[in-house]
Amino acid sequence: MASKSSITPLLLAAVLASVFAAATATGQYCYAGMGLPSNPLEGCREYVAQQTCGVTIAGSPVSSEPGDTPKDRCCQELDEAPQHCRCEAVRYFIGRRSHPDWSVLKDLPGCPKEPQRDFAKVLVTPGQCNVLTVHNAPYCLGLDI
């Protein structure tokens, strides 16, 4: 049987390990409303529709001023998301294959959702917003889940 003096350090080590694990997990959430806005990348809808189908969304702000174009607004919103949550923000934006109705994207006249999804997958890349992600590179892996 183990003595009291050997159990105490083991118990202390276990408690410290669980406290450390909980502390490192704090702030790592990437859910809509927790770590991300409730509608992640809502500001990217206009840019994605323009790029994929050449259409504008009724009611969207129209500007060609430097820093206030649809691409600028989209990239700013993506840049404001925590780096470790950017791919998850794109995932929410395009919707999961298992729940396509949960997408921020909408079928528009002359602009189906699928081409918009395909374009939105590259929003983080160097040719678009060029932001670092959880992979510490401007790419998101596994967005077709």
From Swiss-Prot:
InterPro entries assigned to the protein according to its UniProt record, in alphabetical order: Allergen/soft/tryp_amyl_inhib (IPR006106), Allergen/tryp_amyl_inhib_CS (IPR006105), Bifun_inhib/LTP/seed_sf (IPR036312), Bifunc_inhib/LTP/seed_store (IPR016140)
PTM text: Five disulfide bonds, which are essential for the inhibitor activity, are probably present.
Xref: SMART domains: AAI (SM00499)
One annotated GO molecular function: serine-type endopeptidase inhibitor activity
Gene3D superfamilies: Plant lipid-transfer and hydrophobic proteins
rRNA processing in keyword set: no
Signal peptide coordinates: 1-25
Tissue: Endosperm.
Gene Ontology cellular component terms for the protein in this record: extracellular region
Record's subunit section: Heterotetramer of one CMa, one CMb and two CMd chains.
Protein name: Alpha-amylase/trypsin inhibitor CMa
PROSITE patterns per record: CEREAL_TRYP_AMYL_INH (PS00426)
Protein's job: Alpha-amylase/trypsin inhibitor. It could be involved in insect defense mechanisms.
CDD domains: AAI_SS
Source organism per UniProt: Hordeum vulgare
Subcellular location: Secreted
Keywords, comma-separated and alphabetical: Alpha-amylase inhibitor, Disulfide bond, Protease inhibitor, Secreted, Serine protease inhibitor, Signal
Similarity annotation: Belongs to the protease inhibitor I6 (cereal trypsin/alpha-amylase inhibitor) family.
